[in-house]
């Protein structure tokens, strides 16, 4: 009889944060909205707060960067560690150190699903439908997968069953699709800058932006719009039709997460051939099931916000059962190891975090070391062939551990 590998138990979980309202500004990392001045990601982008003129010009003005980066590290009895980052900051540290630790420490490093289910059920009374608590749970879940991979000496994608393709091809999200084309990406997704409070003039301005980029990028390069929950269904339908002459591939997250009937209406009335996508700010498996039922074309969960890798795999199965694509929102290596195993993810997103989109900067810079970036718009599976998620924590960052247990 062959010997079975004996797996260690988890000795301790620790939580740090960087950036956010109680620390240094512009820290970047897991909270990638926390950038310095003159960055495209904070330049008059349409949001649900844009209708208030005091908060129209900058997303940081209404506090998009107040949370900061949460770093969760889990240590096994043999001294090996796994870690992950997300957006939850100091408050996420409290949840990990004062509540979730009891479900983690003492468990086997392979008990990921058990820990995940216990965290979800234990926080139901204060987690609502996602948000900060789910971001924190997601970060713990990712750290557990990282630890498990490092203990058994395998990359996470092999723990999920292995790659179904040799490489991941990417589109780029940022203000300059024309530069993304030069870098080898298959498409470029731009933020909208106007919303319902701007009326038809706003539609004309955003449609003109798409027209300009279509002229610069040529006929075949994908162009998409990210609306970041800033519209109502009537405005979204009008904008979609205004952009149809420029072969807009999809229109994304036009409505707030819970407006399922609105998404159904938008999909029904969108121009033929234009896809409707959403999911970035949905925070539970149940919400993705309901979103899938609206008939949208692509679901876009963020693995750092939706419940972690454990939930992302379940979301992909829901999408696959309906013939839908699942294309996660950004998330770097945490997405890479998942999507290369999904048959319904033919491409993925790369978020441009350089201020003017002119250079390739790792999404979670500077908190991750050895974080890969696409080369000619692609990442080969061999780049992912390192234990766990294949990245290391940059301990030279200003890490703060406000709580312990």
Curated annotation (Swiss-Prot):
Catalytic residues of the enzyme: 329
Molecular function terms, GO-annotated: L-rhamnonate dehydratase activity; magnesium ion binding
CDD domains, A to Z: MR_like_2
Needed co-factor(s): Mg(2+)
Catalytic activity: L-rhamnonate = 2-dehydro-3-deoxy-L-rhamnonate + H2O
Assembly and binders: Homooctamer; tetramer of dimers.
Task performed by this protein: Catalyzes the dehydration of L-rhamnonate to 2-keto-3-deoxy-L-rhamnonate (KDR).
Protein family membership: Belongs to the mandelate racemase/muconate lactonizing enzyme family. RhamD subfamily.
Name of the protein this chain belongs to: L-rhamnonate dehydratase
UniProt source species: Escherichia coli O6:H1 (strain CFT073 / ATCC 700928 / UPEC)
């Amino acid at each position: 009889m062959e010997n079975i590998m004996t797996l260690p138990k988890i000795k301790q979980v620790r939580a740090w944060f960087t950036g956010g309202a109680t620390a240094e500004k512009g820290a970047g990392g897991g909270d990638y909205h926390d950038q310095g001045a003159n960055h495209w990601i904070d330049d008059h982008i349409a949001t649900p707060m844009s209708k208030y003129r005091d908060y129209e010009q900058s997303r940081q003005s209404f506090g998009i960067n107040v949370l900061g980066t949460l770093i969760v590290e889990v240590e096994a009895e043999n001294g090996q560690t796994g870690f992950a980052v997300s957006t939850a900051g100091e408050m996420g540290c409290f949840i990990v150190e004062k509540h979730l630790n009891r479900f983690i420490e003492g468990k086997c490093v392979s008990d990921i699903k058990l820990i995940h289910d216990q965290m979800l059920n234990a926080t139901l009374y204060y987690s609502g439908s996602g948000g900060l608590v789910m971001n924190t749970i997601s970060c713990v879940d990712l750290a557990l997968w990282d630890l498990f991979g490092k203990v058994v000496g395998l990359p996470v994608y092999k723990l999920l069953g292995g790659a179904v393709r040799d490489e991941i091809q990417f589109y780029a999200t940022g203000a300059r699709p024309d530069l993304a084309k030069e870098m080898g990406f298959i498409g470029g997704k731009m933020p909208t800058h106007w919303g319902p409070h701007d009326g038809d003039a706003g539609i004309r301005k955003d449609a003109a932006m798409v027209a300009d980029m279509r002229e610069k990028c040529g006929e075949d390069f994908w162009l998409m719009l990210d609306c970041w929950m800033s519209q109502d269904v009537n405005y979204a339908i009008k904008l979609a039709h205004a952009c149809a002459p420029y072969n807009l591939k999809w229109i994304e997250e036009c409505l707030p997460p819970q407006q399922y009937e609105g998404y159904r209406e938008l999909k029904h009335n969108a121009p033929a051939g234009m896809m409707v996508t959403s999911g970035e700010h949905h925070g539970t498996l149940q919400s993705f099931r309901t979103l899938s039922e609206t008939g949208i074309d692509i679901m876009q969960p963020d693995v750092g916000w939706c419940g972690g890798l454990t939930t992302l795999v379940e979301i992909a199965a829901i999408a696959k059962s309906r013939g839908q694509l699942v294309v996660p929102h950004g998330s770097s290596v945490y997405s890479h190891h998942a999507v290369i195993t999904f048959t319904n993810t033919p491409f993925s997103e790369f978020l441009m975090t350089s201020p003017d989109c002119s250079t390739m900067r790792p999404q979670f810079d500077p908190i991750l070391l050895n974080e890969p970036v696409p080369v000619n718009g692609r990442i080969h599976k061999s780049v992912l062939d390192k234990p766990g998620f294949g990245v290391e924590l940059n301990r030279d960052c200003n890490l703060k551990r406000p709580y312990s247990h």
